[in-house]
């Protein structure tokens, strides 16, 4: 088995599942978390049983700096590794508005970082999304890949 088999199967990102953002003055391409979870579920199986986080810890020792540190073990069928992340817990610099979604945001960001180590959405992290020609090719490639799938009949949902 090729060491890059998983990487090669998950490295191309559907541009429709991304959006441009400005974070701290940096222009980035963010990936929709549910898209990442779907990709990982396709590769590994259901979240929480065959892949996900275990031993989750939130460390508040840097709280006086406005930071909380997330640490967990990311597991998947081929192994596991420790991942950590930090996030600001305040919505403002005056430290008057607590971000009550900080834990969810921190875990989601850690999931993105963990999956990126395995090659998920590697084209974004390798800077390919800065090239519009690449983005157009990725859109074409992902459209062809998903075309054979059956479309959802929305009339049955009403």
Identify the role of each PLM range.
Residues 1-37:
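N-terminal, Lys/Arg- and Ser/Thr-rich interaction peptides
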Residues 2-3, 134-158:
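Interfaces that engage single-stranded nucleic acids at replication/repair/recombination sites
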Residues 31-32, 36-141:
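Positively charged, aromatic-enriched nucleic acid-contacting surfaces
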């Amino acid at each position: 088995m090729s060491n890059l088999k998983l990487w090669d199967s998950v490295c191309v990102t559907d541009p429709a599942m991304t959006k441009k953002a400005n974070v701290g003055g940096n222009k980035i391409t963010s990936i929709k978390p549910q898209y990442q979870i779907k990709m990982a579920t396709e590769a590994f199986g259901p979240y929480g049983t065959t892949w996900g986080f275990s031993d989750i810890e939130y460390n508040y020792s840097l709280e006086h700096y406005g930071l909380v540190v997330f640490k967990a073990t990311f597991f998947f069928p081929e192994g596991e590794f420790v991942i950590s992340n930090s996030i600001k817990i305040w919505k403002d610099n005056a430290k008057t508005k607590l971000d009550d979604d900080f834990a969810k945001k921190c875990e989601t960001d850690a999931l993105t970082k963990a999956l990126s180590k395995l090659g998920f959405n590697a084209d974004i992290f390798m800077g390919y999304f800065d090239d519009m020609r690449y983005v157009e090719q990725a859109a074409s490639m992902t459209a062809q890949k998903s075309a054979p799938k059956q479309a959802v009949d929305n009339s049955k949902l009403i």
